[in-house]
UniProtKB/Swiss-Prot annotation:
The gene is rpl21e. Belongs to the eukaryotic ribosomal protein eL21 family. Gene3D superfamilies: Ribosomal protein L21. GO terms for biological process: translation. It holds the Pfam family Ribosomal_L21e. GO terms for cellular component: ribonucleoprotein complex; ribosome. Keywords: Ribonucleoprotein, Ribosomal protein. Coiled coil: none annotated. InterPro entries: Ribosomal_eL21, Ribosomal_eL21_arc, Ribosomal_eL21_CS, Ribosomal_eL21_sf, Translation_prot_SH3-like_sf. GO terms for molecular function: structural constituent of ribosome. The keyword Glycoprotein does not apply. This is Large ribosomal subunit protein eL21.
Length: 99
């Protein structure tokens, strides 16, 4: 038998797809929201923008904005005890409303 591949988007069919009524561009408020260093954000992957999307393991994670790189934001989050740095655009972020 041939070994099955495990690519970057492996096991993400439901996660990285939109329902028919959600297709198309997101609202402008999500794209134009300005984050400042120290703001808490939720990583919420938008499947419309594939090239700037973080890996699916970060979906739903809460992180802290530590800076910018061009239009993108540098986010610090944790996977278990490990600190991870993610660089992604505002399409994949939303403000964290919790405490």
């Amino acid at each position: 038998m041939v070994k099955r591949t495990h690519g970057y988007r492996y096991k993400s069919r439901k996660l990285l797809s939109k329902a028919p009524r959600e297709r198309g561009m997101s609202g402008l408020s999500r794209l134009l929201y300005e984050y400042k260093p120290g703001d808490k954000v939720v990583i919420d992957i938008d499947p419309t923008f594939i090239s700037t999307a973080p890996h699916r393991r970060y979906q739903g994670k809460v992180g802290v904005v530590i800076g910018t790189r061009g239009r993108a934001y540098v986010i610090e989050t944790y996977i278990g005890d490990k600190k991870k740095i993610i660089i992604t655009t505002p399409e994949h972020l939303r403000p964290h409303l919790g405490g």
